[in-house]
Amino acid sequence: KLRNQMRAEIIKLRQRINTTFMYVTHDQTEAMTLGDRIVIMKDGFVNQIGTPQDLFDRPVNLFVAGFIGMPVMNFFDGCKLELKDGVYYANVKGVEYKLSDFQQKALKANGQEPCDIVAGIRPQHIRVGEGKLSGAVEVSEMLGSEVDLHVNCGGDDVVMVLQTIDL
């Protein structure tokens, strides 16, 4: 409760003094809620600069993708980027997923050829019954308004977040 109150007070202070405000933190929640722009660093090097939403939606590498978001992004090794009739797909465990319009444009602009990839899927973007991956729920974490499910999908621990109102 105190941390939430302090974040709210810092936001109010920043609005009141109406000036550039630099806040250094290792806490992702503080960075996401307090920052208009965030600088993600590792080992003294800048990995990405962007708005909280940009970092969440379009991480530039695996470090940023795994750092931003709770629970952390699911990573799948041994996947393939495929190109069929001018459309890009990620082949994850034998299942093809059409990439977003943003991803399509970026890949086409770079003339990306099919290749091996590590696929990343946010727990909030996985839906029960909508895909073709199957698995067994091993752990269920009830958090009130949402539930985190840890699902064993062929040896991979896949985390998904469901809103309890949807259950």
Model-derived regions, located:
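Non-catalytic connector elements of ABC transporters
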Residues: 73, 83-167
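C-terminal boundary and immediately downstream tail of ABC-type ATPase nucleotide-binding domains
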Residues: 58-89
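ABC ATPase nucleotide-binding domains
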Residues: 1-63
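Residues located in well-ordered beta-strands
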Residues: 51, 63, 77-79, 134-138
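Beta-strand-rich soluble domains of envelope-associated proteins
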Residues: 37-40, 55, 70, 140-144
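Short glycine/serine/threonine-biased micro-segments
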Residues: 42, 48, 67, 76, ...
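Generic structural "secondary-structure junction" signal
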Residues: 4, 19, 70, 75-77, ...
